[in-house]
């Protein structure tokens, strides 16, 4: 992975600020997006910057645009986003869990309630 500070600079973030990367996959995750909407102000007050990948089916309220929040519909470069993050909040998909394990990144995993045979 790239260096954390370099990754943050490349993403237009402050290099020495705590950073959370939040995503729900290419389509996004409604529950994650709604939780993020409700948390924007708390992140700002805590001095935490957020990389928020919403998915292509979600458009956040323009009032959620804050200097500490970078909103993206889709992420092409997961490596840089992973590198920039201190912690990741995401769906508990098998590929994502494998990626997080390989890079040893702390994560909060959100189960997908409609997963076939409860495979989460």
Residue map of PLM features:
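Donor-sugar nucleotide-binding helix/loop cap in glycosyltransferases
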Residues: 100
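Short flexible/disordered coil segments
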Residues: 1, 52-53, 115
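Short, charged, surface-exposed secondary-structure boundary motifs
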Residues: 1-2, 81-82, 118-120
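Donor-nucleotide binding loops and adjacent catalytic segments primarily
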Residues: 6, 11-90, 97
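Short, acidic/turn-prone active-site loops that include or flank metal/cofactor-
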Residues: 74-77, 112-117
């Amino acid at each position: 992975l790239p260096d954390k500070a370099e990754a943050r600079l490349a993403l237009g973030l402050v290099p020495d600020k705590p950073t959370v990367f939040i995503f729900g996959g290419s389509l996004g995750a409604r529950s994650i997006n709604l939780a993020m909407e409700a948390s924007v102000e708390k992140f700002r007050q805590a001095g935490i910057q957020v990389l928020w990948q919403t998915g292509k089916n979600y458009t956040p309220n323009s009032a959620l645009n804050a200097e500490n929040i970078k909103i993206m519909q889709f992420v092409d470069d997961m490596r840089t986003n992973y590198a920039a993050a201190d912690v990741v909040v995401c769906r508990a998909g098998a590929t994502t869990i494998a990626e997080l394990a390989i890079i040893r990144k702390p994560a909060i995993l959100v189960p997908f309630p409609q997963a076939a045979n409860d495979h989460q």
